[in-house]
Amino acid sequence: MTDTSDGPAPDRHTAFRRLHHGDRPLLLPNAWDHASAAALVRRGFPAIGTTSLGVAAAAGLPDATGATRDGTIALARGIARLPALVTVDIEGGFGERPEEVAAVAAELDRAGVVGVNIEDGRPDGTLAPLARQCAVIEAVKDRVPGLFVNARTDTHWLAAIGGGTPPSLATTAERIEAYVRAGADGIFVPALVDEHNIGALAGDLDETPLNILFTPGRHTYERLAELGVRRISCGSLLFRAALDHAVELAWSIAHPGVPARADQAADLPGYAEARSLADDFTGAGPT
């Protein structure tokens, strides 16, 4: 059943879609709290996303486990009041059944959010069954047709964070094609860094925007644009950079004679390191 309650005005939904089809790719910075969101909007970014890792780690909770459902929704309500278009990372959807995920999406839509990011990676390091994930996308689009659903496949991401070998591009393409048929408005393939593969997927998708996670040292905005990428996400990069800068600044005050690191970007804490910060609050960290 289509949700007819108050939400973003149709022109906001349309405006967000248009950002994916402009002359240049949409650069989407990802906030983790009210202050980071407001700072990005003040800088002039027309659209912002949230980072599930940043939201989770800032709350002392593990990422990608559904633990931040309430916090994510509360944050979304707050930052949706800013003069920018907001899309929210809802991990796997914060629900087991498709209708539960659709209810979360409808709640966010009522709050003024214009898009959601839904991933198929599961906490146990496996991919959700393809049919189940398609049912989730279909349920969300049926409930809130105007909401931009960015369907994320973790075929490459799970391999990257687990130290494994990514599957063939055909495996990723199979999921992508199914998600588009289910109604996805955009496709996100984090940890896909090979330029040939990026260009191939972008070409195959045609009018469906391909979203790539920006990887410092591997990507440039201009090159991704040349490859046909329509949306470039920062993911947890800004959160990790903020953590690193804060720690290094504090250290430099106490140790004024110690030179700064030569390559700040290369030495940023990685996803696993940032995610492990939550262990210090759950009893799984150092003793």
Question: What positions do the PLM features span?
Answer:
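Alpha/beta enzyme core
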Residues: D3, G7-V88, G93-C234, A241-V247
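Extended, intrinsically disordered, low-complexity segments
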Residues: T2-A9, L237-T287
